[in-house]
Structures are given as C-alpha cells and as structure tokens.
C-alpha cells in the first residue's frame, strides 16, 4: 500500500460514518424524548399521511360522540317533561271519570271542570317552556333535527319531537248516526281499519227483542276494539217534547209487545201512575221510564234494544206519533282522529245509511276546555233529536191553554179553540211543525195561504197566521259539566295519553339508536387511535436498542477518527 499525507482516506471514512451515526443518534434521541416514531415528514412520509388521517378521524369521532350525548340530553329533557304531562293527563282522565256519574251535581262538575282547565293550562305551560339551549322542544318545531354522528359529512341521525300542547293531542274521532226508526238485520264492515284491510262484524238484528238492537251491535263492535281501534256506544232513549200533561192511555197500550193497558195519569204524572205502570214491566220490555228535570217523560232502553210503543200512550205523555218506534243512535269513537269508513247492508237501521245525516267531528283536548260546539256535541251523540249538526225541533201543542191565555193572542173567535178548552192543536194539524236550523234562535210567523187547508171559512180554522217560537239552540256546556261530556273527555284524555306515549316511544327509540351509535363509534375511535399509535408512536424497547447501538458507534467512530489521524504519523518515520 502507498503512504499519503495530503488525503487521509481512513480519517475521511471514519468521519463520514460518524456523521451518519450522529444523525441516527439524533433521530433516536428525538424519538425517545418525544415518544413519537414520526417527528417529521422525512421520518416516514406515507406513514405520516396515514397517521394524520387516522388522527383526524379519531378527533372527529370524538366530537360525534359529544354530539350524540348532546342529542340524548335533549331527548331526555323532553322525555322527562312529557312524563309530567302524562301525570297531568292521568289526573284529567281521573277527574273526568269522577264526573261521569249522575251522583255529581252541576256545581261539583263545574268545579271538576275548573280543575281540568287549570291542569290543561299547566300541560300547555310545560309544552311551551321546555327548551334546550334556547330551542323549544315540545312546541312542534323540533322536527327532523339532525345530529352528526360520523367522521364523514351527512352521517346523521334525525330526531323529531311532536307537539304536546292540548290543541295538538287527544284528537279523537266521533261519529254518530241519525236517529233510527226502522228495524232489520244489519251487516257492518269497517273499511281499511289498519290502512289496508277491512273488518266485517257478525250480522246483528235491530229490533225490540232481548239481545238485539244497538246494544248488541255495540257489544259486537267493542269485542274487536283492540284490533280495529273503533269503539261504540249507543243511546236508545225516547223523550217527550213537553212536560207530562193529564191524559189516558188506551186499553191496548203496549211497549215492545208487552201490554200495559189503560192508565189515567195527572199533570206531571204527580200520581206516578204512568211511570210506575211502565216500570212494572221493565224487566220484560227492557224499557225504564222516568221524568227529567223539566217533567218530560223519558223512556230508556236498558240493554240497547229498540223502543216500540203500540196503542195510544196519550197526547199528555208528550210522545209524538213519529217517536213511537225508536231504535236509537249509534256513536263510534276512534282514538287516532281519522275518519271511520263503514260499509254494509241495511245501515239505515242504525242511522248510518246513505241518506242519513251522520254527524262527524274530530275533537282535540283543548276543545273540551271551553264550550263544546253544537256540531261536536252532535257527533258525540249528546242529543237523541239532533242530526248532521242541525237542531231539529218538533212541537205539537198539547193544550191551547198553554199557548193562549186571552182572546186576541193569536187565535180569533170562531176558530174552534176556546181559552182553556184543552183541545189538542195537533188535531187541527195533520203533522207537527219541524224546524231545522243551526241559528242561535228562531222566532217566525208562518203565513197560511189559500188552499192550504187553513183558509178562512174552511172549517179547520179562521186564523191566517201561525206564530211559532223555539228556544235558543246553544252550544253544549264545557267538558265534564254533563255526563255525556265527561264520557267524551275520558275518551279524549285517553287519546291524548296514547299520543304522548307514541311521542315518548319515538324519543326512546331515537335515544336507543343514539346510544348504540355512540357505543359503536367509541369502539371505532379506540381502534383508529390504536392504529395511529402503531404508526406514529415509538416502540421504546426497540428504540432503546437502536440508541445503544448508535451511542456505541459514536464512541467507536471517535476512536476510529483518532486512530486514522495517528496513522499519518507513520510517514515521519520514513523521513528519519
């Protein structure tokens, strides 16, 4: 080998290796001090890109978890508020049930209604004030609200909370047929009861026999109420149009085929003869007699069979000729507020034929707070003599003395009706006058033209005008202040409870969905962080070994450079 002084190859190699080793030692120290395998892009370019992507995903998933927890907090707030509303509705239904018995007076029912009104106000107060971060939750505006629960955009869960104000819940469908005056076999089908299928009930006979009539039909309908969602009630009641006057029944007077015979009764049935005679056979006829607060005769079917009067009950009873055969009114109730579509055969026998006026209305909880409108009351079946939302007033005059107290009050001399004669005006008229109007009050004069049978000198009468006045037709009183109203409020409160339960069930489902999602993305976040750590974080055991290696190499490199420099001294020996 040659000896050179100008270029120390050994020293250069030792220096070069020392520089490389020093760089590796610096990297090792950097990794050990930071805990990261990748401290710069130069350490691992592709690894850094993957690690950064994983870090971003993990951070986003962390915020998604927070979003989900916020959503759960919102839904829990609404759920607890609705729990209080349900307690209020339970109390409302309890008070309506308390009012739904005739042991209550108008005064006590009015107090119960006042309590119900205050409860409704509190229910609405909860609905209008429950909020989260300034956002109303129960007002109906919290609809299709989205919560980001993924690392990528549009990975959301939607939540909707329905309105819970009294005007939005409890919407109950009431449908009541017209008064039925015909018997027969009825086949009833509810169309699309579940949105798809029809439900056909067994045929029911409408008659005056035991086990027939609207009572039997209502029983048949109610057996399947859980499936169809439709419940039925009935009202088979015949009420006189005026207070009982003195009169006599005929020898062949009978109710539902059971002969009662001749009865002499007094004004107001003060001797109790008429009511007692009818009630003496009530177990056979199924019809019970009573007097209402105005002294009118009331015949009520105990089991929903029809009421048929044959023979002559007497004009003093207040029962008109067209009332002698009565099969009542059928009322249907559906708690979801949707129309009740029916079809079948002989539906006119239950007042629901194509030509009958069927009263229909959907009523919310709030509408039971104030006065119930005439239309709603009719749909609920409040009055046996209403139909199609119209007020039907039928009046035959029982005694002239009740309508004329002196000459010149509407009847002229020679008319055939003297003051106090007791003659029945219906004898002079072939039919009663029927007024159908939705007006608040009625007072009209009906002028009789020539040829009508009431012209002067006709022998029927010598008056040229007939004056009629009917009582005001007002809305029914509020809520539970009547027995029928209390029953209706029970139905409405039950619907409202069902509505809130449905909303709460939806909220619960979304909460569960959110919780499952949070659990899933929490696991995903852990795995993503683990993957990032594998790429980015340093393995201290491995790196410590590397550090020891590079540290020893650094020391040996220094020794090598020292020895390489000493080699040049050997040239001097050649010059000695």
Swiss-Prot record:
Keywords linked to the UniProt accession: Bacterial flagellum, Secreted
Keyword Disulfide bond: no
Transmembrane segment boundaries: none
Task performed by this protein: Flagellin is the subunit protein which polymerizes to form the filaments of bacterial flagella.
Gene3D superfamilies: 3.30.70.2120, f41 fragment of flagellin, N-terminal domain, Flagellar export chaperone, C-terminal domain
Name under which the protein is recorded: Flagellin B
PANTHER family named in the record: FLAGELLIN
